[in-house]
């Protein structure tokens, strides 16, 4: 982790001078400012709470960095996090990155310039060294930012197993998975691995269908309709609930008999789509744990690297 002292040593100035450059306090020559800014750039250092700690200030402000609020799971999780933070005396500042690297960089700089005490990170568009350079305490949700960053997640792998097992138990033999961004750092990757393992155990063939999360709703409808028309799947595991609802509706319109299991289990789904069988994540517990861990990190407590909460299979009401 790059520290304020490292910047000072590289620039050949005092730590106080680096802090004054960061906070724009007092008179400084252009040459000094340039030296400090170049040192920060060379070291990939992003100013944070350490710089303002010299002034003894804390705004009780936590940055929340997530891909989007369009996804109902993220929307509910963010709401629960904000509520838990408020109870603990903290306010939240939200940044949505939309899977855009530059947008994440810009928002990260904005959060740190606004002197957040810590960041709860649910997005991942940068490199490991970019996250290592951030001195502000970080707790990640479902993302492996660096080997040293604490990460909180649901048991996505077990969720994939439970979903696939439910489809097999309901009589499905030709089971597809509709998945989004399943790179190795994505939670859907582990859900897919659970699906693959359970099919292997039952000697069933795999059918992996990519449905990129960046697609518009209209694009998803068109593509999924084509897929269902051209295949005779009798079971589909969707790695998110919104896609699962879409698959169920399109299959019904096409008069196809299809068992569908989703993933997330939000209050919205439970209230408005009670007939959807899904893998339910413990959203309240996730939010409470994320808030507790980031505050403990801010307070200087030692915490573990990995925290994983169990998921449950929630059967829809026929």
From Swiss-Prot:
Short name of one Pfam family: Peripla_BP_4
DNA-binding region: 4-23
Origin: domain of life: Bacteria
Domain (HTH lacI-type): residue spans on this chain: 1-56
Signal peptide stretch: none
Molecular function per GO: DNA-binding transcription factor activity; transcription cis-regulatory region binding
Keywords assigned by UniProt, alphabetized: DNA-binding, Repressor, Transcription, Transcription regulation
InterPro entries in the record: Cro/C1-type_HTH, HTH_LacI, Lambda_DNA-bd_dom_sf, Peripla_BP_I, SBP_2_dom
SUPFAM superfamilies: lambda repressor-like DNA-binding domains, Periplasmic binding protein-like I
Record-linked PANTHER family: LACI-RELATED TRANSCRIPTIONAL REPRESSOR, RIBOSE OPERON REPRESSOR
Primary role: This protein may control the expression of the genes that are involved in the transport and catabolism of sucrose.
Name this polypeptide is given: Sucrose operon repressor
């Amino acid at each position: 982790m790059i520290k304020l002292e490292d910047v000072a040593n590289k620039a050949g100035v005092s730590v106080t001078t680096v802090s004054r450059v960061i906070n724009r306090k007092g008179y400084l020559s252009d040459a000094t400012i340039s030296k400090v800014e170049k040192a920060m750039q060379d070291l990939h250092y992003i100013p944070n709470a350490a710089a303002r700690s010299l002034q003894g200030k804390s705004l009780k402000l936590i940055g929340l960095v997530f891909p989007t609020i369009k996804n109902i799971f993220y929307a509910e999780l963010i709401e629960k996090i904000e509520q838990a933070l408020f109870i603990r005396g903290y306010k939240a500042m939200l940044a949505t990155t939309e899977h855009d690297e530059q947008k994440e960089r810009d928002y990260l700089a904005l959060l740190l310039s606004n002197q957040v005490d810590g960041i709860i990170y649910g997005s991942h568009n940068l490199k490991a060294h970019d996250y290592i350079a951030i001195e502000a305490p970080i707790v990640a949700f479902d993302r492996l930012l660096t080997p040293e960053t604490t990460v909180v997640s649901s048991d996505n792998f077990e969720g994939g197993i439970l979903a696939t097992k439910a489809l097999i138990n309901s009589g499905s033999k030709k089971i597809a998975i509709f998945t989004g961004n399943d790179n190795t750092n994505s939670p859907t990757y582990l859900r897919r691995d659970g699906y693959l393992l359970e099919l292997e155990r039952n000697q069933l063939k795999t059918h992996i269908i990519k449905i990129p999360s960046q697609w518009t709703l209209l694009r998803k409808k068109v593509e999924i309709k084509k897929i269902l028309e051209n295949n005779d799947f009798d079971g589909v595991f969707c790695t998110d609930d919104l896609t699962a609802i879409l698959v169920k509706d399109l299959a019904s319109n096409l008069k196809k008999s299809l068992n569908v299991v989703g993933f997330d289990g939000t209050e919205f789904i439970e209230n408005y789509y009670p007939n959807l069988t899904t893998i339910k994540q413990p959203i309240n517990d996730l939010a409470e744990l994320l808030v507790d861990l980031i505050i403990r990190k801010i307070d200087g407590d030692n915490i573990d690297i990995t925290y994983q909460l169990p998921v449950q299979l929630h059967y829809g009401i026929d």
